[in-house]
């Protein structure tokens, strides 16, 4: 079976279509022995593993092997036994896709870690998985990372043929005028921004199929597999979760009316809050809290995780202001603490930076607020173009 899997590995690596080199590739310490890569369905986790193999090993180098736990072979053979065979044959790096498809996966990874000291394992899993929190056997030995959908920077590099680097939030704040000029010297970001908001986050927009239909299928899989299977929720509750997602999508980006949602979905308030948390873990929604608050308290705002999801859920009815705020929140997600703002600002970031998302000239300015504007391509002092925040990763 090892030979068959090597042939599959060679074919997949040879034919992988990875037109954009993901920023995460350079952020991972590949010398770590156990690396977990989480990400929502559709963001390119499989492609990422194959891209790593192609960059670091020759096609016929048997030191690296990609396997997918969806293979029926692993229904009759343990991961530990297989890893042992690979290790004895001279294997050094085992790339495991969809590791959660095998029961007791975390114990198996721990056993591999203990038994094969020279073997490095890189595995992918659903964004719903809480790798170390729910699997204490991985504490202290596993480094976890998040693979996200395309940033606007990655989308620009692909569509405009540029080679833009990511910038930090501080760089954008302090040097936004210069950065904007440098970017516009090689491409026109305004030409591509609307397309990115509509379909640029998920790499499968490159496939010659209907993007919206594909995204709806992916969203259903997120709920049916990532939420129900991993959270062990009975199938009979599937319709309730889908209805909740729809109700949240059409109600805008404000605070959820938990009592009304509980009545609409026919479940308890506590269950509604748990379902919203699961949808957030699946990267379908984002929960935005006030400063000092967190789950299980009710969030101050519930937003779609990215703007592509907004177009899929409410085609033709996307509120522009909600969309702009969703883009900004998504651009900072995972790397910065984004909280609900007050009357003068939309968001409070990292506890002290105040941002107001706008589509027009501010009538009055507060000196401690950064005005993020969607209606400009170049900024001035504390007014910064919205698209620049798409260069954060």
Predicted segment positions?
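A cross-kingdom feature that marks ATP-driven nucleic-acid transaction machinery
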Residues: 1-15, 42, 55, 69, ...
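Pre-Walker A adenine-sensing motif
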Residues: 11-30
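Hydrophobic anchor at the beta1->P-loop junction of P-loop NTPases
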Residues: 37
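Conserved lysine of the Walker
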Residues: 45-46
